[in-house]
Amino acid sequence: MKKILTLLLCLSVMLTACGGSVPGSEKLNVKSEEIQFAQPQPGDTVAEINTDAGVIKVLLFPEIAPKAVNNFIMLAQNGYYNGITFHRAIEDMLIQSGSFDGTAAGGKSIWELEFEDEFSDQLHHYNGALSMANHGRDTNGSQFFFVTSKIGGLSDETLARMTDASWREEVIDAYKQAGGLPSLDWRYTVFGQIYDGLSVAYDISRVKTDENDKPQKDVVIQSISVYTVE
């Protein structure tokens, strides 16, 4: 996960200084056909993450990232995440959790081994994305993070570079509206998207932290429930 921080710092100059707060609604106001901005439908799998800062509701994508979703669900159902803190909070970037010892080093998958990445052009690091943390290629365990960068905070230069690199027009447009961290695409596995409670994630990202970006006051995951929408 240290690679995330280095990459973000390198690209921070490409982010505009405008914005930084979440609109009054807890949902992104994005007009897009990209699946991450759809509301849950019957048959979809969702997770409710209860924290002492509020509830974050996430739409999961088991068809696209089956191992990441299955790992997350099984760990949640086994109570693994109960009582675990958000051990990293970086304003306008991300919040991270999933380490049993409250550090960036702890954690393991349901298989007790690291598992491979599941990249897809259907899922991207828009604001509100839920993604697996790792320390290199195919090193996924139990840690995850939410993207909480500036809403609509991508510079024209960044968007132009994405166009030059032949990113899909729909993805570029979604990033333009929602903001996010496109530099993390194809490096970390996205497997979910916040559809309610985005402001809770942003509140966590703005807490006071120490020199290691660890919140000075613990922000705790109380429980995670997973269910199928009826």
List each model region and its residues.
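Sec-dependent N-terminal signal peptides of Gram-positive bacterial secreted proteins and lipoproteins
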Residues: 2-21
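Cyclophilin-like peptidyl-prolyl cis-trans isomerases
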Residues: 18-230
